Amino acid sequence: MPMDKPEYAAFPLDITVRFAETDQMGVVHHSEYIVWFEAGRVAWMAAAGMPYTEIAGAGYNFAVTDLQCRYRNAIRFGDAVQVITRLGALRSRQVEFIYEIRNPHTGAIYADGHTRHICVDGDGRMTRVPDWVAQRLLGKVKGEAYSANA
């Protein structure tokens, strides 16, 4: 079931940078971007009607196998950011998510990247993405933007 690079609906997650997320230089620590990617991914999945808790409750997980983050501009304490997440690709055993961290007022990109995940069962063995999960993840396409209130 290869689905290479169609434009799926984006889900925006608004975040205000907390002091604890900054480093000694007064900018957001590089590790926080990855935490925000995860928060965006979990929120995207919930908005798609596929809460991660439901997947895990059914005995499946998505193990991270690849992660890339390109840092483009510094973010500081108190800044408003928006993590925009979309499905990048869905294959029989792999899911990819694409992320942009933007300034919600100017649209400036602070960072972008992706994560790739392998579907694993409760014993940690690689398995196919269940059809019921794939169907829900594929449920929205470009032009059908997710709402934070959905």
Specify the residue positions occupied by each region the protein language model found:
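Residue-level signal for pocket-adjacent positions within structured domains
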Residues: 20-23, 40, 50, 57, ...
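Catalytic strand-loop segment that frames the active site of acyl-thioester-processing enzymes
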Residues: 2-47
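Conserved beta-strand segments that form the floor/walls of ligand-binding pockets within enzyme
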Residues: 14, 29, 63, 70, ...
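Hydrophobic beta-strand-centered segment that forms part of the acyl-chain substrate-binding groove
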Residues: 44-95
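HotDog/MaoC-like acyl-thioester-processing domains
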Residues: 2-13, 46, 75-77, 87-150
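Residue-level recognition of specific faces of alpha-helices
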Residues: 33-36, 63, 98
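Hydrophobic residues in beta-strands and at strand termini
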Residues: 15-19, 71, 119
